[in-house]
């Protein structure tokens, strides 16, 4: 038997369900009820207009808002961290709240650190992260209106971004690294419990996307 539940529907005091402790507890619930399959909606980024997991600016990157704040290495949420209504999701305020925290943490990383090598050694991932930086710079304008030399990825473009927009680049590298790190831990735990995770893909990838 199986059950469909997107992580955003899990309980969380930070405004939106995530792939942290509540997700591990849900795996325990599935094991206890002899449920073998956990089906998810796509885990990619969503547009800031529709918030649909099927409409994404990237088919490869993870949704940073699914990152559990309590499981970020060397970060402890303070008692002053805002808590949200547990019965509904205010996407815009949640995104603003989490992005502020992610940005502050990300500025302390060194993108030359070997821990980021695997992520950045993948040219497709690197190109999609570059797209997100440019998307932020252009204020969500469609890529066809960008400067010509920004419309097509190249290693030279990435190097320019690394020099001129390092703060934004750090933000997106950190959030993607942390998403995939936490997601790998959850998948490993589910495998140990013999719970199969059945995923999905963003079948309506936006025109205004890295793809």
Where are these regions (language model features)?
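Acidic/aromatic-lined carbohydrate-recognition and catalytic surfaces
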Residues: 1-211
């Amino acid at each position: 038997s199986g059950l469909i539940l997107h992580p955003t529907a899990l309980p969380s005091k930070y405004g939106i369900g995530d792939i942290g402790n509540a997700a591990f507890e849900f795996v325990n619930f599935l094991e206890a009820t002899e449920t073998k399959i956990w089906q998810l909606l796509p885990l990619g980024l969503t547009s800031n207009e529709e918030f649909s997991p099927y409409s994404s600016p990237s088919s490869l990157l993870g949704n940073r808002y699914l990152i559990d704040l309590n499981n970020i290495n060397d970060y402890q949420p303070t008692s002053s961290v805002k808590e949200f209504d547990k019965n509904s999701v205010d996407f815009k305020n949640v995104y603003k709240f989490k992005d502020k925290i992610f940005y502050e943490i990300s500025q302390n990383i060194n993108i030359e650190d070997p821990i980021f090598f695997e992520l950045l050694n993948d040219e497709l991932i690197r190109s999609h992260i570059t797209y997100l930086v440019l998307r932020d710079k252009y204020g969500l304008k469609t890529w066809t209106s960008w400067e010509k030399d920004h419309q097509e990825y190249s290693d030279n473009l990435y190097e320019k971004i690394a020099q001129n927009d390092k703060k934004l680049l750090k933000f997106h590298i950190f959030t993607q690294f942390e998403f995939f790190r936490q997601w790998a831990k959850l998948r490993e735990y589910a495998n140990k419990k013999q719970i199969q995770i059945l995923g999905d893909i963003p079948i309506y990838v936006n025109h205004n996307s890295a793809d």
